[in-house]
């Protein structure tokens, strides 16, 4: 194996302003140590130090570091160098192998990381060699998902505030798709941030507000509905207190508008980038996967096909495969808690959407429920099956085939 021929290993203990570097040989002898700054000069100093100890394009020195992000990692990943992102908890266990005094220092941690590669490189996985487009999709998809979560967080704050003084607004918008994040809800609440102002809205003002929000039909029905709600009797705060709550609502609505705009803009950017990728057609052939959800899945699994040796590895990474804990007479099989949470989040949405889009997926889910699985367990089981099929399709460059994927279940249903 390629790691058998390596004789030099590098460990980096990273920080915000500087990084400690340690280089060891295959016997554990410290060849060099240094502290570099977190800038171009520091990165060049690191590359020069590696070159002094045999680093080249043909024989790059592998590097261990406790992060997979940042400009330092990007500089190290140029070329064919293997960069290993070591979990800090795992690194802490290695620190105790050579002493129990629990002493700790940044140069010492860099040495520990270098020795991890020297002794146990085969047990750790290098960062995947994803394409530039796949890395861009990862950035956009994660940013869009974060924007959606931020939007919901601010919407929850708006909802909590409205419960304090403005129940009519909740009655008017919360039951509709999108709830308080809807454009018409945000426009109307900006026009009338208090119950007193809402009760004074005229039909013309409501019509203008709905038009400004982008609504194009069913004006009269919606206008009458809103006016009826806003002029109904509800419990009220004192006038001065109500006005103060109104100012707070306007501040939150400005934040909500910004998060909604960010989520929409990022969704467009994600979809455009995703459709440029060669794997997009395969992902979109699966039931339940659209451009946005497909991009989230691709963002987490990447396009380095050597990353997962088999479907089981992908399932374990996603957290859909169960884990076994056995010791003596004890034997337990349960769900995984250490997993890629973003991939699992996208996977649950994928499995749920597939119930309506795929008869085979629906039959699989129903069979698991009949066997006693709860909803979440049945969805996780369905996702586990989908991931195995996705791994096969990506490796063989095939599109999803409903008849082949769920043939026994479809035959039984027929």
UniProtKB/Swiss-Prot annotation:
Keywords: DNA recombination, DNA-binding, Transposable element, Transposition
GO biological process: DNA transposition
GO molecular function: DNA binding; transposase activity
Keyword Manganese on entry: no
InterPro entries tied to this protein: Transp_IS110-like_N, Transpos_IS110, Transposase_20
Alphabetized NCBIfam families for the sequence: transpos_IS110 (NF033542)
The protein, known as: Mini-circle putative transposase for IS117
Species this protein is from: Streptomyces coelicolor (strain ATCC BAA-471 / A3(2) / M145)
